[in-house]
């Protein structure tokens, strides 16, 4: 069969490879001039920067894409586990290194607060049990009809997850120390949600980091995009770049998706899998006479969106890779207040920031004697933060100064401004324009309880035959391992339909 995949982000690349490995003819259409989507790369002034995700968790999910296609993952990506997850800075003189080794982890916890290990390990045990339930009964399956969700098994297993509790509540149940609470709460920002709003299930992120470890891909995270692109090439997939989809064509008589309009041409296909940002697809790519019924264009703005981010890609003329960790977090003096600012639409003058120094793990990513630095500051998305004008150069300059002051928390960056030889910024406006991310959301639809599982946009269209959806705003959600899972379960449903002649 001829299959179209819309979008060459990590979801689209993984999905296309899985389909092609089953013997089908696959074409990927990508609006930009490179693959990767939000897993993007910037090469500038001799530096190589990942532009989006940077932390490799759940490496088995990465490997599975290749092995499921009959290939050896080691022929495409080079993975290695990190001994330390990150350095966390509470203040200039207050740094904690978070290890993956259990004995070192216990030593770290006891140095923060004697006796805290028991509560911490109880938290990890509880969250691991919830993760296993969620993975088996909710995350790794689709919901094609109401009875797939509304049944006794889902009711019983869902009750065990205690999804009405928020991430903060679960953490505070086991942990009294405020520093340790912060160590477990900030990761909900990896998927763009407030820990006070995110279901307690999203506490799985620190559990996954500490129990399964954090890895690095040679070449940076973009190495995964390149590996997937090569996998597709080896499987005979055709990738068309600079190919922006104008419309998904619906046959009104048979209510099926049978073509796409791309760069003015109508291209016919047997099935279409769309991995582009779902809200933008529902708003702009469906014909007026054939909207997605649950998500018509006029309702898209009313959905809840994850936060956005202000990113800086900085090159400096000194090599500091032996004085800083690969992954670093610098907390705001008022962590909770900063979270409120992000989700209430206000800019912070004392933000928590994430700092990634890739040459610590791969010297090829910066010129000899120099260092590239990636900084992420969570911000409101463009709906909640409608009063923020990201095109205002005075404003972005002010934010850069805030970030440079915050970076000075790390001793080696105290005089960073005098060493800058390259600087690039990426704002919420850029998320919207580059990736068609609705409201510049960095992680798609916010995974609130009302926008999760059965209540999230589904992988198999309920309105039109031969139309499928995958990606961060669809089930099961955002984050690289999760969108890779989205690709897998969606393709499984498509192949099942093909085999059954549906």
UniProtKB/Swiss-Prot annotation:
Enzyme Commission (EC) number: 1.3.8.-
Organism domain of life: Bacteria
Pathway, per record: Carotenoid biosynthesis; staphyloxanthin biosynthesis; staphyloxanthin from farnesyl diphosphate: step 2/5
InterPro entries: Amino_oxidase (IPR002937), Carotenoid/retinoid_OxRdtase (IPR014105), FAD/NAD-bd_sf (IPR036188)
Enzyme class per UniProt: oxidoreductase
Entry GO MF terms: 4,4'-diapophytoene desaturase (4,4'-diaponeurosporene-forming)
Pfam families, per database record: Amino_oxidase
Ligand binding (FAD): 5-17
Keyword Flavoprotein: yes
Keywords: Carotenoid biosynthesis, FAD, Flavoprotein, Oxidoreductase, Virulence
GO biological process, one term: carotenoid biosynthetic process
Catalyzed reactions: 15-cis-4,4'-diapophytoene + 3 FAD + 3 H(+) = all-trans-4,4'-diaponeurosporene + 3 FADH2
Family note: Belongs to the carotenoid/retinoid oxidoreductase family. CrtN subfamily.
PANTHER family given in the database record: PHYTOENE DESATURASE
Task of the protein: Involved in the biosynthesis of the yellow-orange carotenoid staphyloxanthin, which plays a role in the virulence via its protective function against oxidative stress. Catalyzes three successive dehydrogenation reactions that lead to the introduction of three double bonds into 4,4'-diapophytoene (dehydrosqualene), with 4,4'-diapophytofluene and 4,4'-diapo-zeta-carotene as intermediates, and 4,4'-diaponeurosporene (the major deep-yellow pigment in staphylococci strains) as the end product.
Protein name in the entry: 4,4'-diapophytoene desaturase (4,4'-diaponeurosporene-forming)
Organism annotation: Staphylococcus aureus (strain MSSA476)
Gene: crtN
């Amino acid at each position: 069969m001829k299959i179209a995949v819309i979008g060459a982000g990590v979801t689209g690349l993984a999905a296309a490879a899985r389909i092609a490995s089953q013997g089908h003819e696959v074409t990927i259409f990508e609006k930009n001039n490179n693959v990767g989507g939000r897993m993007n790369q910037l090469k500038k002034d001799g530096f190589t920067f990942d532009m989006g995700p940077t932390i490799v968790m759940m490496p088995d999910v990465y490997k599975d894409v290749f092995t499921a296609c009959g290939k050896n993952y080691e022929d495409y990506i080079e993975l290695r586990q990190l001994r330390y997850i990150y350095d966390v800075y509470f203040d200039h003189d207050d740094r904690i290194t978070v290890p993956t080794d259990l004995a070192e982890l216990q030593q770290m916890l006891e140095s923060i607060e004697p006796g805290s290990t028991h509560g911490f390990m109880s938290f990890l045990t509880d969250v691991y049990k919830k993760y296993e339930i969620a993975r088996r009964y909710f995350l790794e399956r689709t919901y094609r009809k109401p009875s797939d969700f509304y049944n006794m098994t889902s009711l019983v297993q869902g009750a065990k997850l205690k999804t009405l509790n928020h991430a903060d509540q679960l953490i505070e149940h086991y942990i009294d120390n405020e520093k340790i609470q912060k160590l477990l709460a900030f990761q909900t920002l990896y998927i763009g949600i407030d820990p006070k709003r995110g279901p307690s299930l999203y506490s799985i992120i620190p559990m996954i980091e500490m129990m399964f470890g954090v890895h690095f891909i040679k070449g940076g995270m973009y190495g995964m995009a390149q590996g997937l692109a090569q996998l597709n090439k080896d499987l005979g997939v055709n990738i068309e770049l600079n190919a922006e989809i104008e419309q998904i064509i619906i046959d009104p008589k048979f209510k099926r998706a049978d073509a796409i309009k791309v760069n003015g041409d109508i291209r016919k296909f047997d099935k279409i899998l769309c991995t582009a940002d779902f809200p933008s697809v529902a708003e702009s790519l469906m014909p007026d006479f054939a909207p997605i019924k649950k998500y018509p264009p006029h309702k898209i703005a009313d959905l809840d969106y994850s936060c956005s981010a202000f990113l800086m890609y900085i090159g400096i003329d000194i090599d500091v890779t032996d004085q800083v960790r690969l992954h670093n977090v610098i907390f705001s003096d008022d962590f909770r207040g900063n979270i409120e600012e992000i989700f209430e639409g206000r800019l912070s003058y004392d933000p928590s920031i994430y700092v990634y120094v890739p040459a610590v793990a791969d010297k090829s990513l910066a010129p000899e004697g120099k260092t590239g630095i990636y900084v992420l500051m969570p911000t409101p998305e463009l709906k909640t933060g409608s009063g923020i004008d990201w095109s205002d150069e005075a404003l972005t300059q002010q934010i850069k100064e805030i970030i440079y002051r915050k970076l000075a928390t790390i001793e080696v960056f105290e005089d960073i401004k005098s060493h800058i030889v390259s600087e690039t910024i990426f704002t919420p406006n850029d998320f919207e324009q580059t990736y068609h991310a609705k409201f510049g959301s960095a992680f798609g639809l916010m995974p609130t309880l009302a926008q999760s599982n059965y209540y999230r946009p589904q992988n198999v269209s309920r309105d039109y035959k031969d139309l499928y959806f995958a990606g961060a705003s669809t089930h099961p959600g955002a984050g690289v391992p999760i969108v890779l899972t989205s690709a897998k379960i969606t393709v499984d449903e498509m192949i099942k339909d093909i085999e059954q002649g549906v």
